Amino acid sequence: MEQSELMVRRIKEGTVIDHIDEGKGIQVLNALRIDGSDGSLITIALNVPSGKFKKKDIIKVENKFLKDDDTNKLAVIAPKATINMIKDYKLVEKRRVSLPNEIDRIFRCSNPDCVTNSTEHIESIMDVIDKEGRVLKCRYCSRVLDVNQLKYN
């Protein structure tokens, strides 16, 4: 097969998440709760050869467009990812993910004694203290969180 040939078919409407760090595609699907239960066609390609990086993962989801919360999750898991919005088989928007200064409601604090894990139903707020290293800190209890062990709300 020539390199210019498509390995997976194009989508008519939806989102293509490209340049996902190698081996993170499944984690991205889980974090974004993309499982096909809504009837959307999902294509995932793992360990695809890449010019920029040695390998990458790609996810295509028909009839789904990411919300800001989804983009923030993606920025933590796969900081080099790009989000491509497709309409009528054409690229209408392309953007790189980037971490905001704070992330609200998406992740749970790993500290069992944190007020956000109490019965009071307080929404979590994570401050991004190092965008390059993807280091988050709970605003309520100051616990520094390992991005590889985050739990999603």
Curated annotation (Swiss-Prot):
Lineage top rank: taxon: Archaea
GO terms, biological process: 'de novo' pyrimidine nucleobase biosynthetic process; pyrimidine nucleotide biosynthetic process
Keyword Transferase on entry: no
GO cellular component, one term: aspartate carbamoyltransferase complex
GO molecular function, one term: metal ion binding
Cofactors demanded by this protein: Zn(2+)
Free-text cofactor note: Binds 1 zinc ion per subunit.
Keywords for this protein: Metal-binding, Pyrimidine biosynthesis, Zinc
Binding residues annotated for Zn(2+), in chain numbering: C109, C114, C138, C141
One Pfam match: PyrI
Described function: Involved in allosteric regulation of aspartate carbamoyltransferase.
Family from the record: Belongs to the PyrI family.
Subunit field text: Contains catalytic and regulatory chains.
Name of the protein described by the UniProt record: Aspartate carbamoyltransferase regulatory chain
Species of provenance: Nitrosopumilus maritimus (strain SCM1)
Highest classification ranks of the organism: Archaea, Nitrososphaerota, Nitrososphaeria, Nitrosopumilales, Nitrosopumilaceae
